[in-house]
């Protein structure tokens, strides 16, 4: 699921919040709401099966939540020598075994079973823009501000730099086994590539900077979207376009993306509070909701950091307002 780098892009998005608020979607209210960060969150990620979420809060470090029981499992602090939490990106591995959390300069990997940190790594030369974690924490994928993407095998230390991009990276993702990666950049291109060889598999061109990318965990689809009005679902086996999302807004930017387990639906979240459900086959928007905003912001707003399918009838979201919310699809 893609969502992790949105804090790095917020400045350019807030300009549009008040305009987008006028285009109100279905006014459905959440079935349930839980507070996971009292004064708001910097980042959040929900596991693909919607049983766990990791939240980076403004004053209380990093928390891992059991979403089935709304129970706090662990509270972590990446910056041991600082009272400020600076974690701006996070990812839960597809097998729910580990969590990666990242600031601009460093990242940590945590065990879900024990709550202990496996290690702490610093990133040199350029800031972290986005990060993804493979199953069993075998490898990590790091998108950087200088346009490079780095794949690191955490077991062997092997490091591969992908140098295909010309400008800063905005989003990265990889398959659960860590073998195939996707990266999107300000150079208007999304690349799908092999993490063993660095070989480009597919190149997806866009008319503006690519702000969001994602891979279906089952290896069926890729997703790429830009900063204006182009969002595509691609066949990961052939590289051919399956559909383009259909929307009427002049601009629609996404902060998170998730494919449904059966491969028929796409779930997106946006910096405008909007959560949307799409039919992959047609590109049509089926339904949309708005997450609860923070009331102390003007205009009252919230960024949807993560969204996931709980089952065929419900979805769950985490947002910058600090709330996890459960929504009914049908």
Locations of regions flagged by a protein language model:
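WD40-repeat beta-propeller superdomains and closely related acidic/aromatic-rich repeat-like regions
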Residues: 2-10, 16-330
């Amino acid at each position: 699921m893609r969502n992790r780098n949105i804090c790095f892009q917020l400045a350019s998005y807030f300009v549009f919040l008040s305009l987008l608020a006028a285009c109100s979607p279905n006014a459905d209210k959440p079935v349930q709401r839980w507070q996971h960060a009292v004064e708001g969150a910097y980042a959040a990620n929900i596991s693909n099966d919607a049983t766990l979420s990791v939240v980076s809060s403004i004053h209380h470090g990093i928390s891992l939540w059991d979403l089935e029981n709304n129970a706090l499992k662990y509270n972590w602090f990446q910056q041991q020598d600082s009272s400020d939490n600076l974690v701006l990106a996070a990812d839960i591995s597809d097998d729910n075994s580990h969590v990666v959390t990242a600031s601009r300069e460093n990242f940590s990997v945590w065990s879900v079973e024990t709550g202990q940190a496996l290690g702490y790594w610093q990133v040199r030369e350029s800031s972290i823009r986005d990060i993804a974690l493979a199953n069993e924490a075998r490898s990590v994928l790091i998108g950087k501000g200088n346009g490079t993407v780095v794949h690191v095998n955490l077991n062997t230390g092997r490091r591969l730099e992908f140098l295909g991009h010309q400008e800063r990276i905005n989003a990265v993702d990889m398959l659960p086994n860590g073998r195939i990666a996707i990266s999107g950049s300000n150079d208007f291109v999304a690349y799908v590539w092999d993490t063993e060889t660095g070989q480009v598999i597919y190149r997806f061109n866009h008319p503006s900077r690519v702000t969001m990318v994602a891979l279906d965990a089952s290896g069926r689809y890729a997703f790429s979207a830009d900063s204006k009005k182009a969002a595509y679902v691609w066949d990961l086996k052939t590289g051919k376009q399956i559909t383009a999302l259909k929307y009427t807004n002049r601009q629609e930017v996404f902060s998170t993306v998730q494919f449904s387990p059966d491969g028929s639906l796409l779930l997106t979240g946006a910096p405008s509070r909007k959560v949307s459900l799409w039919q992959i086959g047609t590109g049509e928007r089926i339904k949309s909701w708005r997450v609860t905003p923070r009331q102390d912001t003007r205009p009252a707003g919230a960024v949807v950091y993560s969204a996931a399918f709980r089952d065929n009838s419900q979805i769950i979201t985490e947002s910058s307002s600090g709330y996890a919310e459960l929504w009914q699809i049908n």
